[in-house]
Amino acid sequence: MIHYLKSFFLYEIVRGMALTLKYFFKPKVTINYPYEKSPISPRFKGEHALRRYENGEERCIACKLCEAICPAQAIVIEADEREDGSRRTTRYDIDMTKCIYCGLCQEACPVDAIVEGPNFEFASLTHTALIYDKERLLQNGDRWEQALASKLRKDYEYR
């Protein structure tokens, strides 16, 4: 019986070493991350951004659909009515530590105001830096507008 267990154990070690050697001589599939970047899918969901119209006016009409549909309750919106009767946001906050990047806010938005952009490098050392206010979201939208617009055009037929 002991001989059987020893031979079984030896067999497993040899089998494991064979598997290791099989992959040892194959080309590496990992990348050297900060210096090399892997391609990103066109439907990648990254850092949030608020978009503007071509004339510079923000797109958000304060319908609060994104706030209502967010499963993590990461979005907080406050709005006021303008003199012309339209509504605009006075406060638009997203707690990125709560966000699960599901994309439901982007799907719910009737005017494509809130989108998830291509940026995935927004780590921070503090919690407060990951609570995005309206100004930060608009800056993200201005910075990534070209990429966001082309991404939405490519995906338009599927929406």
Curated annotation (Swiss-Prot):
Name the source organism.
Rickettsia africae (strain ESF-5)
Listed binding positions for [4Fe-4S] cluster 1 are C60, C63, C66, C109
- Record keywords: Translocase included? yes
Question: Which compartments is it annotated to reside in?
Answer: Cell membrane
Task: Give GO terms: molecular function aspect only.
Answer: 4 iron, 4 sulfur cluster binding; iron ion binding; NADH:ubiquinone reductase (non-electrogenic) activity; quinone binding
In this chain the 4Fe-4S ferredoxin-type domain maps to 51-80, 90-119
Instruction: Kindly state a single biological-process term from the GO annotations of this entry.
Output: aerobic respiration
Q: Please tell me one Gene Ontology term that the record gives under cellular component.
A: plasma membrane
Q: Which SUPFAM superfamilies match?
A: 4Fe-4S ferredoxins (SSF54862)
Q: Which PANTHER family does this chain map to?
A: NADH DEHYDROGENASE [UBIQUINONE] IRON-SULFUR PROTEIN 8, MITOCHONDRIAL, NADH DEHYDROGENASE UBIQUINONE IRON-SULFUR PROTEIN 8, MITOCHONDRIAL
Annotated function: NDH-1 shuttles electrons from NADH, via FMN and iron-sulfur (Fe-S) centers, to quinones in the respiratory chain. The immediate electron acceptor for the enzyme in this species is believed to be ubiquinone. Couples the redox reaction to proton translocation (for every two electrons transferred, four hydrogen ions are translocated across the cytoplasmic membrane), and thus conserves the redox energy in a proton gradient.
Query: Per its UniProt entry, which superkingdom is the organism in?
Result: Bacteria
What are its cofactors? [4Fe-4S] cluster
Tell me which EC number(s) this protein carries.
7.1.1.-
Q: How is the cofactor bound?
A: Binds 2 [4Fe-4S] clusters per subunit.
Cite the record's note on assembly. NDH-1 is composed of 14 different subunits. Subunits NuoA, H, J, K, L, M, N constitute the membrane sector of the complex.
Q: What is this protein called?
A: NADH-quinone oxidoreductase subunit I
Q: Which family does it belong to?
A: Belongs to the complex I 23 kDa subunit family.
Task: State the annotated membrane topology for this chain.
Answer: Peripheral membrane protein
Q: Pfam families from the entry?
A: Fer4_7 (PF12838)
Residues annotated for [4Fe-4S] cluster 2 binding in this entry: C70, C99, C102, C105
Catalyses: a quinone + NADH + 5 H(+)(in) = a quinol + NAD(+) + 4 H(+)(out)
Swiss-Prot/TrEMBL keywords:
4Fe-4S, Cell membrane, Iron, Iron-sulfur, Membrane, Metal-binding, NAD, Quinone, Repeat, Translocase, Ubiquinone
Q: Cross-referenced PROSITE patterns, in alphabetical order?
A: 4FE4S_FER_1, 4FE4S_FER_2
Q: Which InterPro entries does the UniProt entry name for this protein?
A: 4Fe4S_Fe-S-bd (IPR017896), 4Fe4S_Fe_S_CS (IPR017900), NADH_quinone_OxRdtase_chainI (IPR010226)
